[in-house]
Amino acid sequence: MNFGRIAAAAVVAWIVSLVVGFVVNDILLAGIVAANVSVLRPEADVMGNLPIGFVFLLVGFFAFAYAYAKGYEGGNGIVEGIRFGVLVSLIVIGFGLIWQYVMFPITATYAAAIVIDSILELALYGAIVGAIYKPVVVTRGKPATV
């Protein structure tokens, strides 16, 4: 396992996620988020909590890249990464995101947007991790002759 590549993949995907998160939440879904503002923290509170979110997001990306490396099957890294990202998104949706809709009074539109965004973003992050991660290649010399 190539831990240097795992770390690089995690950090690059994390940096991309910061940009994508801003574009998605503050631009593309701004209207949907505004329609659900009554169930969200005030913006000042969110800004104060961002460092916590960023740290745990980075930890999550290390786990994501490590899990990808453990399951890497030796094929096209980007394709394997997309497949891995979609699989992880389905786990996250089933165990976590859908429960936001069940537990909190968000609109069905917001819930659907979160689900679709999660699939697309995690597929993107999987592609990034798959493009960067390369396993350590072990070369074996010729067997000794007597």
Language model features with spans:
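Juxtamembrane/disordered regions of integral membrane proteins
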Residues: 1-146
